[in-house]
Amino acid sequence: MKFNNGKSMKYLRIFFASIISFLFFISCSDIREDIPISAPKITLHKDGIKNPASPNFHGKLVSNANWDMKQCQQCHAANYNGGTAESSCYNCHKTPGGPEACNTCHGDFANTLRIAPPRALNGNILSSDRGVGAHTKHLYDNKIGKVVSCNQCHIEPASGFSDPSHIDNTPGAEIVFGSLSKLQTNVSGGFNYQSSLGNFVPNPGFDVSDGSCSNTYCHGYFKNGNLDNIVLFTAQSQGAACGTCHGNAATGNPLPKTPSQGGSHPPSLNCQQCHGDVVENNNGNYTIVNKEKHINGKLNVFDNEFEF
């Protein structure tokens, strides 16, 4: 295009300048307006983080981190109330202690009174599993003896969940025997003390290879008891069958050692004659009638309890 005079060129320049100014004005107006933004959702966890059946379940992540909850606290706060993630762990972990409650990792997640396996750390609920074993029999549903507390076999953490006695770098739960398993019998001044027999001083042991207990008062290491009794933690009902702790395990005869066997118990099978508060004998069928008075560290004779 050719322009023959300066006036036409001037008008053309004014025209283009007007268009540019108009476009600039429109652009500035658009920029000054709020632009709707759809912020992308940022997620740290993979799908299935709340699903126990998922490989991405957060319980598995904590297990893989050797039960270190600090990684959770980085986003959910030290008290698990939400933190920067703005998602409180107490939405699901509703019991006192939240994620650090005893029944979170082992026991019944729905029942704060059942803090020991089952469930075991591996999720198993069968008593034939090493992690489950006889926990229920010892702590909750003992039909033949007084129930015990956790500290009779384990150290209870003094400073909370992360206490070194609870969370450490060694796999499995440490067995630290309490006072009941170490109870001495035939002590001087006790009921029917026999100086010739000496003191019976248990030296409790736990065999990690097979999960067995030995030399414990609770399973036979007492005066007139079966000192060499070894019981598997997974033995189920056979671990406490009549005759295992005192008497003859093969026949089920519960008669403790008599003088002819190196003991001091009278050779009588009429248990209830002397121990009526504890046991009944109906035609050879022995039934514990008061479990609170059996395996409780005392000798119950004629409705009275004695040190022995």
Q: What residue ranges belong to the model's regions?
A:
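Flexible linker/context regions in extracytoplasmic redox proteins
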Residues: C28-N66, Q73-Q74, A78-F308
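Sec-dependent bacterial lipoprotein signal peptides
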Residues: M1-I26
